[in-house]
Amino acid sequence: MVLEVLNPRHYNITSMVTEVAPVASIAILLLTGFLLLVWNYEDTSSIPGPGYFLGIGPLISHCRFLWMGIGSTCNYYNKTYGEFVRVWICGEETLIISKSSSMFHIMKHSHYTSRFGSKLGLQCIGMHEKGIIFNNNPALWKAVRPFFTKALSGPGLVRMVTVCADSITKHLDRLEEVRNELGYVDVLTLMRRIMLDTSNKLFLGIPLDERAIVVKIQGYFDAWQALLLKPDIFFKISWLCRKYEKSVKDLKDAMEILIEEKRQRISTAEKLEDCMDFATELIFAEKRGDLTKENVDQCILEMLIAAPDTMSVSVFFMLFLIAKHPQVEEAIMKEIQTVVGERDIRIDDMQKLKVVENFIYESMRYQPVVDLVMRKALEDDVIDGYPVKKGTNIILNIGRMHRLEFFPKPNEFTLENFARNVPYRYFQPFGFGPRACAGKYIAMVMMKVTLVTLLRSFHVQTLQGRCIEKMQKKNDLSLHPDETSDLLGMIFIPRNSDKCLDH
C-alpha cells in the first residue's frame, strides 16, 4: 500500500482517504482531548464538588441555586459531596461549608466581613453599598454599623421590653382582625404587625398603616430573595424585572413618606431630646455629610423590615413547637409564674428565664429561619487545609452544622440539647465576630417578651395533625413556611386568669 501511495502511477485518492481517515480521526480526537485536559487543568481543585467540565459544571450549579433556592441547594451539595464543597455562582467559585471549625475561622476574621450577591440585583433593591444587611463595601458597612449597635443596645434594649409588651397586649385585644372565618388565627400576620409596630416605635416614631406596610415588606423580601443571585442578563429583559421593581418601589415610596415626615418633625422640634432615636441619629449624620440621603433611607428601611421579616417567622415556628410539645409548654409556664408572676415583665427578668431561653435556642436550632450566612474572602487564606483565593464566595450552612456536631439528639426537638452549656462555635444562630448580627441581643429579649406576654394570656393549638415537620416550606435566602397553604392557622384559647397553668 505504501509503495502504491508513493508511486504516482498507482495513486488512488479514494483508496487513500478510506484507509487514512480512521487514523486521522483518532489523532484529532486525542489532540482535542489533550487540549481540553490542559485547558481545564487550572479548574481542577482539591476541594470536593462537581466538576468544571468546559463550563457546564458552573452553569448547572448556578441553575440549581436559581431553581431550588439557596438553602435547599446548599443542603443538596453538602449531602452529596461533604461538609466543605466547591461550586459556582454566576461563574464565581463558591464554597459551601457546614464544618464548625471552618465557620469559626471565617466568622472571627475581619477579611470575611464582605457579603456577595448580584450587583444589579442589590442595586435594584437598594442594598448595593447601602444599609447594613447586604452592604458588601466593608468601609461603608463600618460607617453605618455603629448607628445600629447603639440603637439595639443600652437604653434602647431596656425600653424595648415595655414597648414590645404593650404592642403585644394591644394586638391581642384586637385578635379578631387576624382571625379567619373559621376562627383560626393568622399568626404570621399577627407577629409581623407586632414586630413592625415595636420597631417603628423604637426606631422611627412615625404613625403608619401596619396592614399596608406589612404587605409591602413581604413584596420587598420576595424581590430581594428572587434577585440576589440572578445573572446580569436577567436585568436586561425589562418585563422579567418589572414586578420585582414595583414591589421594591412600593415599599421605598411608603418609607420615603414616613422618613420625610420624620425630617419635618426634627426640623420643627422645640427639644431635640424628645425625638432622638435611630432615625434621628442617621438624619443628623446626613446633615453633617457623613452619610448620603440614600444610605440613610436604606438604613431606616432595613431596621424596620428586619423583625417582621425573620423574627416573626421564628416566633411562628416556636408556637407550633409549643403546641406539639405540651411538656415544654408546662415547663415554660411554671418558669413564667415563678419569675414574672402576675406583674409586668421587666428587663431584669431576662437572665432568669432560662427555660424560655433554652426553648428559643432549641427552636432556632431545630427549625431555623436564617440557616445560612453569605460572605466573600477579601484575602487569600487557608481554611482547614484548603486554599481559598481572594474573591471566593462563601456560604456557611449553619442550619446543617447545628444538626451534625455536639448536640446529643440533633434530629429531635428536645430541651435536652441545651441541658448543658453549648460552646458557641457549635451554635451560631446569630453568627459572631465582626459581622455578627447587630440585633442579636435585642432579638433574644424581644422573643422572650413576646412568648411570655402571649403565653400568659393564651394556650395555643394547631389544627389536628398539623406540625412543623409536615409543613410545606421554602428554603431560599431564609426558610419560610409556604404561605399559599391554608394549614398555617392556629387556635388561641384564653387562659384562666386566676391560674396560669390551667389550659
Swiss-Prot record:
This protein's record includes keyword Nuclease: no
Catalytic activity annotated for this protein?
Answer: testosterone + 3 reduced [NADPH--hemoprotein reductase] + 3 O2 = 17beta-estradiol + formate + 3 oxidized [NADPH--hemoprotein reductase] + 4 H2O + 4 H(+); androst-4-ene-3,17-dione + 3 reduced [NADPH--hemoprotein reductase] + 3 O2 = estrone + formate + 3 oxidized [NADPH--hemoprotein reductase] + 4 H2O + 4 H(+); androst-4-ene-3,17-dione + reduced [NADPH--hemoprotein reductase] + O2 = 19-hydroxyandrost-4-ene-3,17-dione + oxidized [NADPH--hemoprotein reductase] + H2O + H(+); 19-hydroxyandrost-4-ene-3,17-dione + reduced [NADPH--hemoprotein reductase] + O2 = 19-oxo-androst-4-ene-3,17-dione + oxidized [NADPH--hemoprotein reductase] + 2 H2O + H(+)
Kindly list the positions annotated as binding heme.
C437
Q: What is its main location?
A: endoplasmic reticulum
Q: What class of enzyme is it?
A: oxidoreductase
Molecular function (Gene Ontology), one example: aromatase activity
Q: Which UniProt keywords apply?
A: Endoplasmic reticulum, Heme, Iron, Lipid metabolism, Membrane, Metal-binding, Microsome, Monooxygenase, Oxidoreductase, Transmembrane, Transmembrane helix
Q: Which family does it belong to?
A: Belongs to the cytochrome P450 family.
Known role: A cytochrome P450 monooxygenase that catalyzes the conversion of C19 androgens, androst-4-ene-3,17-dione (androstenedione) and testosterone to the C18 estrogens, estrone and estradiol, respectively. Catalyzes three successive oxidations of C19 androgens: two conventional oxidations at C19 yielding 19-hydroxy and 19-oxo/19-aldehyde derivatives, followed by a third oxidative aromatization step that involves C1-beta hydrogen abstraction combined with cleavage of the C10-C19 bond to yield a phenolic A ring and formic acid.
The name of this protein is Aromatase
**Organism whose genome encodes this protein:** Leucopleurus acutus (Atlantic white-sided dolphin)
Which gene is this protein's source? CYP19A1
